[in-house]
Amino acid sequence: SPALSGLDPGAHALVRIATLIAVDAAPPSYMSAVSAALDAGLSMEQIVETLIAVMPTVGVARVVSAAPKLGLALGYDVSEAFEVVASDDLER
């Protein structure tokens, strides 16, 4: 809990998200951490920037694996986004 960690709620939520990225957690695991981050007043951009912050430590492959999971937790329709990219590639 944030009270036990000594961190403010926003920092605590970002640490939780960073940990989920590091351990390659399943998509449902991101839901409560993202909810806590948003409840703490963090923006979606700040939450996504966690991917960039942890990349030097966890590696690109782990961040690439985590990005769609984090996107789903933020409410993005990740499969639709991939379909748009695929159709754009077909049109070229």
Question: Over which residues does each language-model region extend?
Answer:
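Substrate/cofactor-recognition hotspot
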Residues: 13, 53, 58-61
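Short linear loop/turn motifs
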Residues: 50-54, 84-86
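Acidic, glycine/proline-rich low-complexity segments that act as flexible tails and inter-domain linkers
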Residues: 1-11, 22-24, 28-31, 35, ...
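Short, structured motif recognition centered on aromatic/hydrophobic residues
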Residues: 11-20, 30, 47-51
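Winged helix-turn-helix DNA-binding recognition segment
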Residues: 42-46
